[in-house]
Regions:
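N-terminal regions immediately upstream of nucleotidyltransferase
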Residues: 1-96, 101-117, 136-138, 367-373, ...
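Terminal (often C-terminal) interaction modules
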Residues: 2-35, 301-394
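Short, compositionally biased low-complexity segments
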Residues: 25-37, 87-93, 212-227, 303-310
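Conserved catalytic core of two-metal-ion nucleotidyltransferases
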Residues: 48, 58-64, 112-200
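Glycine-rich, often proline-containing surface loops adjacent to acidic residues and nearby aromatics
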Residues: 92-102, 224-234, 269-271
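Extracellular structured ligand-interaction cores
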Residues: 97, 134-136, 143-145, 248, ...
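Long, charge-rich alpha-helical interaction segments
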Residues: 193-245
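Conserved nucleotidyltransferase catalytic core and NTase-mimicking acidic/glycine-rich helix/loop elements
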Residues: 233-344
Length: 394
């Protein structure tokens, strides 16, 4: 039965009205995006390995006879904590960042001296597996990469926040998201975490100062604000109807797979840029991808200054040259055109083919339409969508 505003089809033993929105049948396209997102996210085994790696590291730090005396707390940051990580490719491993909040006075210890305090601990537990980097200590295990990021002593008020169980917990933004959608909590700690990370910008607790981390190469202590990065992402995801973190994952995958040899922007700078360009109130991941790419094309012909979350004087794009940005911008122009064509396609099969052109083979293929349904543009799916917990949808 053909209706004036859509097409009534029978699929999965139920009638579904597929309304053309933006030129395509969004309810069906979303099932393809759901499987795509399931394909590119960290696997359960990779998440388990990350947890094994960071919990072992944090326990060893807390139990170390020397370091335990100067450590206030440890907590997770990075794309894993923000739920914007995608699965690694080409033999790379999953990674997680561990912030180590210390009592060290930045006036008494140079960055190099602060990092060197960890060497005996590293020699004991991670001999031949660690490297001292510019602003952190990298640990490469057979199954996961870890980054230790030490900080200098925070203020007294900040110390209390950084020792809060919800901050030092391992809950990710997707964990918070589930509770935001269902308003249900299975323990007091998760409810407390939800309440803290869903606070608004003007809450006093988020007037906290940035932390100082050692920059060995610049020979100075530098500001960072990982908690504000987490809070900002939680808020943005809520404002985007929980689609934001999936827009980030989709575009990270595009960057990783379609332009693997392009040096910049790397993971977090790209994520930050997506955050600045993705509109609020998007109705789907597909819409978020299209509008984000088009906003970059229309608003950022030249390399912008990207003010870091919580440290606005820092430029997230500082390490990117104008030439590198120009190369990246050209790739975005191409991607924006493909994404818009995919979004506006009249036929589902053609739309899916365009999305696969953008995202590669992890975006599931659509069977070619038969003569019986080619006139409607509807392609019946032959495979069931992968199960993704509520909230992880396109």
């Amino acid at each position: 039965m053909i209706l004036s505003k859509g097409i009534l089809v029978h699929t999965h033993n139920q009638s579904v009205l597929l309304i053309k929105g933006g030129g395509l049948f969004m309810s069906t396209v979303q099932s393809y995006f759901k499987d795509f997102l399931s394909n590119i996210r960290l696997s359960d085994n990779q998440v388990k390995e990350l947890k094994t790696g960071h919990t072992t590291l944090r326990r060893r730090l807390e139990e170390d006879e020397t370091l335990s005396k100067i450590i206030i707390s440890t907590f997770l940051q990075g794309s894993y904590r923000r739920s914007t990580a995608v699965k690694p490719k080409n033999g790379n491993k999953s990674d997680v960042d561990v912030i180590v909040v210390t009592k060290l006075d930045s006036e008494e210890y140079t960055p190099e001296e602060a990092l060197d305090l960890f060497v005996p601990f590293l020699e004991k537990h991670y001999k031949d597996k660690y490297r001292i980097q510019g602003r952190s200590i990298g640990i490469s295990l057979s199954y996961v990469d870890l980054d230790i990021v030490p900080t200098s002593a925070p203020s007294e008020s900040e110390t209390e926040v950084l020792q809060d169980e919800t901050i030092i917990s391992e809950y990710t933004i997707e964990d918070f998201q589930q509770k935001f959608l269902t308003k249900s909590f299975n323990n007091d700690l998760l409810e407390s975490a939800y309440n803290i990370f869903y606070k608004s910008d003007n809450e006093p607790q988020w007037k906290a100062e940035p932390l100082l981390i050692p920059d060995r190469e610049a020979e100075k202590w530098d500001k960072t604000h990982p908690l504000e990065q987490i809070r900002w992402t939680v808020e943005k995801n809520k404002n985007c109807n929980t689609h934001y973190i999936n827009v980030v994952k989709a575009l990270k995958w595009w960057r990783k797979t379609q332009y693997p040899d392009m040096k910049h922007p790397k993971s977090y700078p790209l994520e930050h840029f997506i955050g600045d360009c993705c509109p609020n109130d998007i109705k789907s991941v597909a819409e978020g991808v299209v509008l984000t790419l088009e906003n970059i094309v229309s608003q950022y012909t030249n390399k912008p200054f990207l003010a870091d979350r919580g440290v606005p004087e820092h430029d997230v794009f500082a390490r990117i040259t104008d030439e590198e940005y120009s190369d990246f911008y050209d790739t975005v122009c191409d991607a924006a055109k493909i994404a818009r064509e995919a979004f506006d396609c009249e036929e589902l099969y053609d739309s899916v083919c365009k999305w696969r052109e953008l995202f590669g083979n992890e975006f599931p293929p659509a069977p070619k339409p038969s003569k019986s349904n080619s006139s409607t543009g509807f392609t019946t799916r032959t495979e069931k969508s992968a199960a993704i917990p509520e909230g992880r949808f396109a």
